[in-house]
């Protein structure tokens, strides 16, 4: 719970400036260059008390002090405008002025007079006698509305103050189940505060652990552990600009449950002496109150079932309602900007991760050879190389051959046998002696083929018989599996587990024809599926040449 620092005296509105903030804080006194801090001349008709001014000490999230002078009848809006002018804050919609009441921060309604938030000494006249000078009235500039994306804050100065506020909240955080998040936040904070890690400058104890870690982590891990491991995490943020590191810190800090939230203590019953319930106003949510009661109706429950808590006084309920209403209205205004930023970030992520589909030149050439006049597309071509059909149109085999340097991928060959050629093969078994059904030697060769990454291609022509062995690298198979799609993985599984009927493929073709252009004659040939072999007979004058794989 957000608790103000100690050492402010009994009355938090009247505080000795020498005791707070901690040492090292910078005090910004009014000067002629800052006209917002200059005293205004009284106008005609104003009484003596209206012409007097009060000293107000405003503490910023960066531990800076602003010493301002405002009129007795000034409103919170006037003081807030002076703070923004002196601190050079242009985008101040996420900040607000608050005072401490009962050890809680109460945000001011800027339309109300300051006399309602300070003690009764505010209206007392000054005596020019020997009376000691008064201590200034203390106010705080704090983050009133949280936002998880720091890019919504357009002003650099306002973003830095927002970062300083979250950094102070992280030091008071108690999320023990997110210990690793605090080390990530510390690394981002070091990158934002100190820049790139340099071995010469950032050696030894170049940062104070108490300024970047909660006390419970320092007690649990120790200072030596933090100083030993944090330089490595700091070096990992190399290349991250201070602005990007600050935005990363804001985003990660808002993911902690007890950082972007305002806590208020409530009573569950009127008779309770001390508050027993803590209400947290987080990034989203709307609450309703009635008089001294704060009434919360949960979404999805009947109207009769309500959670009722008591604030103790009407003044607290009124200001709590004002804070809830203002937070809700602000998030409604910021929602379109957040959506645009989210879409832009998603578009940037898509540019970093793209999917590439690579196809072979042979496949593109075969796909472009479809007959426009015959009405047959390349999808129905039964004997062309295909990578996209998963069922192969009833074909029984898948052959993968690496024969040329330009053909580097295994492909599915779907070839349907013409009806007349199938009859010729049944009548003439001698023309293809290696296409016998379930031959023992064929099974032995198939097992050897599975073990050895070698393919034998036997070519028999008119005069000579040549045997070629083509070595297939297993690395090519793994590259295919990573580069192909789902269809190729199914075809690869079919190639690993072929049907046991036959492993020999016979192609009867004319000598003057080429295998690269079978689609030109396919439309005129009748086809029939064959379960034993894949045969293609292109009639010609020369005797056929047989390829056995």
From Swiss-Prot:
<dbReference type="InterPro" id="IPR000299">
    <property type="entry name" value="FERM_domain"/>
</dbReference>
<dbReference type="GO" id="GO:0035332">
    <property type="term" value="P:positive regulation of hippo signaling"/>
</dbReference>
<feature type="region of interest" description="Disordered">
    <location>
        <begin position="1"/>
        <end position="40"/>
    </location>
</feature>
<dbReference type="Pfam" id="PF00373">
    <property type="entry name" value="FERM_M"/>
</dbReference>
<feature type="region of interest" description="Disordered">
    <location>
        <begin position="377"/>
        <end position="400"/>
    </location>
</feature>
<dbReference type="GO" id="GO:0098592">
    <property type="term" value="C:cytoplasmic side of apical plasma membrane"/>
</dbReference>
<dbReference type="InterPro" id="IPR014352">
    <property type="entry name" value="FERM/acyl-CoA-bd_prot_sf"/>
</dbReference>
<protein>
    <recommendedName>
        <fullName>FERM domain-containing protein 1</fullName>
    </recommendedName>
</protein>
<dbReference type="InterPro" id="IPR029071">
    <property type="entry name" value="Ubiquitin-like_domsf"/>
</dbReference>
<feature type="compositionally biased region" description="Polar residues">
    <location>
        <begin position="444"/>
        <end position="462"/>
    </location>
</feature>
<dbReference type="InterPro" id="IPR019748">
    <property type="entry name" value="FERM_central"/>
</dbReference>
<dbReference type="InterPro" id="IPR018979">
    <property type="entry name" value="FERM_N"/>
</dbReference>
<feature type="region of interest" description="Disordered">
    <location>
        <begin position="422"/>
        <end position="464"/>
    </location>
</feature>
<dbReference type="Pfam" id="PF09379">
    <property type="entry name" value="FERM_N"/>
</dbReference>
<dbReference type="InterPro" id="IPR047145">
    <property type="entry name" value="FRMD6-like"/>
</dbReference>
<feature type="domain" description="FERM">
    <location>
        <begin position="54"/>
        <end position="369"/>
    </location>
</feature>
<feature type="compositionally biased region" description="Low complexity">
    <location>
        <begin position="430"/>
        <end position="443"/>
    </location>
</feature>
<dbReference type="GO" id="GO:0005856">
    <property type="term" value="C:cytoskeleton"/>
</dbReference>
<dbReference type="InterPro" id="IPR035963">
    <property type="entry name" value="FERM_2"/>
</dbReference>
<dbReference type="InterPro" id="IPR018980">
    <property type="entry name" value="FERM_PH-like_C"/>
</dbReference>
<dbReference type="InterPro" id="IPR019749">
    <property type="entry name" value="Band_41_domain"/>
</dbReference>
